[in-house]
């Protein structure tokens, strides 16, 4: 019996040595940019619905080999609360959309609807179904973190794809049934985008084509958008209408944390950061702590 334990111990020693070496090789830098204790007073938010932008500098005291992972950290946020965890409609996240029969969203209580002015009668209001509904989806971390133009020019651009589980992206989160989009073009004397958007079944009610970061234009359609508010409408600074629930920041957020203090992956830098190099980050803020690892 003792011999068996000694043998097992001997087998685990090299594994422990390897894991310890990898752990010691991790380089971490973090800065709190909002809340009590933050030195970045320019980043603080004191009112709701405030767009606040600030820049944070990181100087590497050690070399960070690629890939460098960028995380945000929240504390005192109980994603593991029973009522919070249960407030989700998996059928809706799989594409089911029907504002006339919303029994499939019952699990989203207490957050299935929001009240908005009635577009047909400004003096009244109406309930609009949220898609996706529920507390998890509608408490999305919506700070926008990006490297500055100067950092991007120096090769420190941050990739925001490949941060979520591949199985989640491909199978678990699907755009609403009936959703479609198509790239369109505007030329002198011929507005393909306007033609598409004026056709029934495209671009929705009084919506303009979506223009991405590369200045490409897209006509798009979401079913029953008069009676449903979709994710891109709830978080226009974070989620585009073309990606919707396929947005990887959203998918990462939907994997709830087990503890009230947690980190979630935001992006990846695919370039070594040499000792002494300084990177600048733009923050469009909510509340959190920002960290980098390699």
Regions found by a protein language model. Give the residues of each.
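N-terminal leader/pro-regions and domain N-caps
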Residues: 1-55
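A residue-identity detector for tryptophan
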Residues: 165, 202, 253, 281, ...
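Generic preference for well-ordered alpha-helical elements
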Residues: 8, 65-67, 276
């Amino acid at each position: 019996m003792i011999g068996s334990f000694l043998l097992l111990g001997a087998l685990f020693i090299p594994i422990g040595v390897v894991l310890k070496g990898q752990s010691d090789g991790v380089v971490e830098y973090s800065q709190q940019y909002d809340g009590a204790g933050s030195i970045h007073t320019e980043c603080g938010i004191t009112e709701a619905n405030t767009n606040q932008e600030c820049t944070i500098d990181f100087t590497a005291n050690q070399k960070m080999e690629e890939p460098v992972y960028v995380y945000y950290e929240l504390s005192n946020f109980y994603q593991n609360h029973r009522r919070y965890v249960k407030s989700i409609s998996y059928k809706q996240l799989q594409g089911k959309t029907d504002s006339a029969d919303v029994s499939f969203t019952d699990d989203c209580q207490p957050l299935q609807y929001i009240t908005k002015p009635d577009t047909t009668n400004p003096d009244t209001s109406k309930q609009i179904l949220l898609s996706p509904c529920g507390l998890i989806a509608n408490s999305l971390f919506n700070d926008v973190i990006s490297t500055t133009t100067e950092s991007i020019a120096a090769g420190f651009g941050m990739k925001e794809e490949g941060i979520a589980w591949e199985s989640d992206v491909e199978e678990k989160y699907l755009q609403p049934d009936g959703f479609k989009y198509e790239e369109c073009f505007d030329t002198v004397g011929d507005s393909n985008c306007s033609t598409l958007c004026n056709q029934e079944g495209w671009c929705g009610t009084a919506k303009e084509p979506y223009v991405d970061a590369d200045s490409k234009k897209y006509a798009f359609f979401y079913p029953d958008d008069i009676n449903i508010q979709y994710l891109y409408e709830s978080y226009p600074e974070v989620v585009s209408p073309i990606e919707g629930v396929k947005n990887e920041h959203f998918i990462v957020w939907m994997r709830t944390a087990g503890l009230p203090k947690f980190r979630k992956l935001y992006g990846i830098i695919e370039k070594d950061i040499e000792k002494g190099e300084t990177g600048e980050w733009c923050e469009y803020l909510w509340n959190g702590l920002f960290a980098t690892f390699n």
